[in-house]
Amino acid sequence: MPSLKDLAKECGVSVATVSKALNDQPDIAAATRERIRVAARRMGYLPNAAARALKTNRTYNLGVLFVDERQSGLTHEYFSAVLDSFKVEAEKRGYDITFINHNISGRSMTYLEHCHYRSVDGVVIACVNFYDPQVVELVNSDVPVVTIDHVFNNRMAVLSDNVAGLKALVKQAWACGHRRIAFIHGEKTSVTENRIAGFYQACEELGLEIPEEYVRDGVYHDVERCAEETRALLALPQRPTCIIFPDDFSALGGYNALAEAGLSIPDDISVMGYDGIYLSRVVNPSLVTYQQNTAALGQTAADKLIELIEHPRVTLPEQLRVSGRLLSGRSVRSL
């Protein structure tokens, strides 16, 4: 394996210059830094982990706090894709990841205690109960934190633009001639609040009057619950012509309930999803949905967490919104 000295010789610079480039020090030209990094990748140079940790007072280990109470785990395609992108970017920057939990060898501990036990440099938090006292304790600690799809005061947050996503779906339904548009949303979280706001904002902009019974309390990733809410909508004296579901997976509940009622999608009723996962492309008919940009969400979260770790004095907490895109399908017909 090549050494720091070998890399310096290859690039025609001093060992000190190579060290500055690899440690992202500011007093080196950007072109020189990039040239050295390209050479390091080409030569397969890897810094000695122990020496690097001793020199920088960092472990180059990032914590991931992911608690999926619905037990869909990392098979939940949306969050799995976000965390995969986070991992790829972290590794590209020389960091490993560790999952944070309550248990180490049978010993119970708080999330913050686990972070200290593993000596992580920072933590990304996603898909948790953000009101859990242990999560709040971690967020309020001195550990650098980036949250995904939730905002804490004075903390870095990376957010999918859920307001824009629902507005895009409503306006697409409107453009297809639909005026009776229902929305089955997920459980009450900041994500849901933003989606509900986007739904009503679009309706207001379009001059749509939406009956209260058209907006239903569903549950993310819960097929049966969304099937129940679909049946409730079908039982109304004037049923909607288009239903927006909490996510693509739960839309399967709508597909099932509509089939049970002898209704055809989209001939009898139109359906929309959210997330843009692979399932939306293979279900029949293919689902009109809003695809969240999981690659950008994960990469941005990693970039911002590493900025907080490596440049704490100049990195300010901010809320970054990541746009998605509308995906066409055959589940909505023009009236």
What are these regions (language model features)?
Residues 1, 10, 42, 85-93, ...:
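Bacterial carbohydrate/catabolite-sensing allosteric modules
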Residues 24, 28, 50, 74, ...:
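Conserved acidic
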Residues 1-60:
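N-terminal helix-turn-helix DNA-binding module of bacterial transcription factors
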Residues 42-48, 104-108, 127-128, 255:
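Short gly/ser/thr-rich secondary-structure transition/capping motifs
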Residues 2, 61-171, 175, 235:
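Alpha-helical recognition/docking segments in bacterial nutrient-uptake
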Residues 19-20, 33, 119, 195, ...:
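Short, cationic motifs built from Arg/Lys/His that form the positively charged side of catalytic pockets
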Residues 33, 79-83, 196:
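Short amphipathic alpha-helical segment that frequently serves as the phosphate-/nucleotide-binding helix
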